[in-house]
């Protein structure tokens, strides 16, 4: 129950520092607009609850980016000979940043030339260190087995990535972008009300 009640603050920590003047700003992202425009394949790779974040996030990313997004279980990704090269963006999602299957999938994708963008909670984790780029969720420790704030913050950050990239690609209407950014800013308070 404690961690459920911490969700509004966790979402605020994940969202607020990245919203400025009605824009999504990722100060810590090294990806350039040119590199983003060059991706022709996008994978979301994760395990457990993070995989389910990817399944939900896929729909929003496809809507915003007008590109196919494939979601893969990390434990299966490296065994299926995925079509991955230097024009592939692989988004790794992990709460701990230490999940072994996810680490193995990251290494396989990187070996094939993919650009790795990770969404993780634990600063300085193995996945964060081995990624080309990392966005932290800043959800804080999560002790309960049933995920709450980690799931919420991962999904919020993934949605922000989609919105930011869509603006760069020109695949989102200005009105939809502005409305969604406004809704993101209100999300922590809306969660608190429920």
For the regions a language model picked out, list residue spans one by one.
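Cofactor-/ligand-binding subdomain signature composed of acidic, glycine-rich
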Residues: 1-39, 160-194
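Glycine-rich phosphate-binding loops that contact phosphosugars or nucleotide phosphates
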Residues: 37-186
């Amino acid at each position: 129950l404690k961690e459920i009640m911490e969700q509004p603050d966790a979402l605020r920590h994940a969202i607020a520092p990245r919203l400025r003047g009605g824009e999504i700003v990722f100060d810590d992202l090294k990806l350039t607009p040119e590199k983003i425009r060059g991706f022709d394949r996008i994978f979301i790779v994760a395990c457990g609850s993070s995989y389910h974040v990817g399944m939900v996030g896929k729909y929003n990313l496809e809507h915003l980016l007008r590109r196919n997004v494939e979601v893969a279980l990390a434990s299966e990704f490296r065994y299926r000979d995925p079509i991955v090269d230097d024009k592939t963006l692989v988004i790794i999602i992990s709460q701990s940043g230490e999940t072994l299957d996810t680490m193995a999938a990251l290494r396989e994708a990187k070996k094939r030339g993919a650009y790795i963008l990770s969404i993780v909670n634990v600063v300085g984790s193995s996945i964060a260190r081995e990624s080309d780029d990392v966005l932290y969720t800043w959800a804080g420790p999560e002790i309960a087995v049933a995920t709450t704030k980690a799931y919420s913050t991962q999904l919020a950050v993934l949605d922000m990535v989609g919105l930011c990239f869509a603006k760069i690609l020109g695949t989102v209407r200005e009105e939809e972008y502005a409305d969604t950014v406004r809704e993101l800013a209100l999300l922590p308070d809306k969660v608190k009300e429920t």
